[in-house]
Amino acid sequence: MYAGVNGIQLYYQKTGRGRPLIMVHGNSEDHTIFDEAVNVLKDHFTCYAIDSRGHGQSSPCRELHYDDMAQDMIAFMTELDLENVVFYGFSDGGIVGLLAARQCRRITDLIVSGANLKPNGTKAWFRIMVAGMGLVKKDPLIELMQREPNIEPSELSSIKARTLVLAGSKDLIREAETRKIAESIPGAELRILDGESHGSYIVHSEKIAEILTEHLL
């Protein structure tokens, strides 16, 4: 299915019944990373697994910015008239969720995994790897990770949604960055998942579905 927002087409799959749950993937991925999780969540939620702009079956873009992606999600919720929304974002999707929840009161529960506030919120080895990729190939997805996000911790104080901040103990995001996010959102809960990496409990995994249902139901 497609929704027209901000002059582009966002592709999404709608599955299940119940409270709306928006799920947004990370950089260079698409909605299919959530297939296994949606299969579990569909009995409790209406899942909207979305391809963000420049990804999957959504409109391609020559240049990408997290703020634009966040505005897309806000417009998506408005277009479909979704209220009392659970927003789950992984990696880049988590960044988008933080930006959207600052101003969108349709989001009443926010769960983010492996998000960062600044490019240096990732570990040094990952930044070196991304820099090398940028030398080999000019790609808006790589450029996005190199120059963004640029979120000040103080900006997160406007988030009113009940928030759960997640990361793996072996995540490519620095733990100090994850803790800073949680500390900057009023009332946020923090969970560092022992033994998990950036996407091990999310990508084609039912583990994230178990975490979400435990937290929300």
Residue ranges and their predicted role:
Residues 8-57:
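Conserved HGGG/HGGXW glycine-rich cap/lid loop of the alpha/beta-hydrolase fold
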Residues 95, 99-102, 110-136:
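Flexible "cap/lid" loop of the alpha/beta hydrolase fold
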